[in-house]
Swiss-Prot record:
Annotated stretches, region: Disordered: 1-87, 284-304
Assembly description: Part of a complex containing DCUN1D3, CUL3 and RBX1. Interacts (via the DCUN1 domain) with the unneddylated cullins: interacts with CUL1, CUL2, CUL3, CUL4A, CUL4B and CUL5; these interactions promote the cullin neddylation and the identity of the cullin dictates the affinity of the interaction. Interacts preferentially with CUL3; this interaction triggers the relocalization of CUL3 to the cell membrane where CUL3 is neddylated. Interacts (via DCUN1 domain) with RBX1.
Lipidation feature positions (N-myristoyl glycine): G2
Main location: membrane
Tissue: Highest levels of expression are in the testis. Very low levels of expression in the heart, brain, skeletal muscle, kidney, liver, spleen, lung and ovary.
An annotated GO cellular component: perinuclear region of cytoplasm
Protein function: Contributes to the neddylation of all cullins by transferring NEDD8 from N-terminally acetylated NEDD8-conjugating E2s enzyme to different cullin C-terminal domain-RBX complexes and may play a role in the cell cycle progression by regulating the SCF ubiquitin E3 ligase complex, after UV damage. At the cell membrane, can promote and as well inhibit cullins neddylation.
Entry keyword annotation includes Kinase: no
Limits of the DCUN1 domain: 86-278
Full protein name: DCN1-like protein 3
Location of the protein in the cell: Cell membrane; Cytoplasm; Nucleus; Cytoplasm, Perinuclear region
Amino acid sequence: MGQCVTKCKNPSSTLGSKNGDRDPSNKSHSRRGASHREEQVPPCGKPAGDILVNGTKKAEAATEACQLPTSSGDAGRESKTNAEESSLQRLEELFRRYKDEREDAILEEGMERFCNDLCVDPTEFRVLLLAWKFQAATMCKFTRKEFFDGCKAISADSIDGICARFPSLLTEAKQEDKFKDLYRFTFQFGLDSEEGQRSLHREIAIALWKLVFTQNNPPVLDQWLNFLTENPSGIKGISRDTWNMFLNFTQVIGPDLSNYSEDEAWPSLFDTFVEWEMERRKREVEGRGTLSSGQEGLCPEEQT
C-alpha cells in the first residue's frame, strides 16, 4: 500500500399597514386639493400627507420603517454566513498546505505531511476512518472536493479540529451499521480506480482486512489470512463478493468452523479455506499425538 493508507443565505418592515385617524380639520382641505394634484407616494408605498395619531407623517414613518435595523433572525443568519465563510477560508489554507504543486489534490507526499501533523501513522486505522468520512476514491490521495466535503462532514476546519474528532469516529465505527458501511467502503478504497480494477490484489486485501478489523478482530481472521498467505498461487485476487461475504462469514460461522456448510451460497474460496483449515488442524492434532506417543517409551531422564 506504499507508505499510507489513503492514496491515506430584505428585512421586512415591522410597522403595520393600518391608517391612523385623520384630523377632522383637514377633511375639506383634502377634498379641495384632490382635483389639483395627485398625492406623492414614497418608496415604501405610503401616501404623503397622512398623519399618524402621534403627529408623525406616514411617509416619514414608512421611510423610517425602510431604515429599521435588521431583526435578530436576520442578524443570526448573517453571523452564520460569516462563520461559514471564515471556515471555508481556513479549509482553503489547510488544503493548500498539503496540496501538490501541479495537481489540485493532496497526493502521497502531502498525505504523509498531513498525517505527520495529525500525529498519526499513515497506515493506521484512524487514517482509514478519515478516508471513509472523506469518501476518498483512491489510496494516498484526497481531491479538493473530498477534502472539503469530508471536513464539513466531521465539522472540522483545522488540524486540531480533525484530531478532536478521532475519538467519536472510533466510537461510530463500532456501531454495526456504520462498520458495515466502513467495511464495504474499504474494498472500493483499495482498488486502483485509474486502472479500472475490479478485484483487490491478494497482498492489498490482506493488509486491508487486518486494518479494517482493528477494533474487532474476529476469531477466524488469523486463520483466513494465513490461508491467503500460504496459498498465493491459487488466489489471484479478492472479488467484491468474496470481500463482502467474508463479513457475514465472521458473524455466523463459529471459530471451530463446524457449522459451515458447502451447500449454502458461500463463495467457492470459502469452501477451499474451510477444507484447508480442517486439514491443518487435523495434522496439528496428529502431530501432538505422535509426540506424546514417542515420549511414553522414554525414561524420565530421557524425556527431560
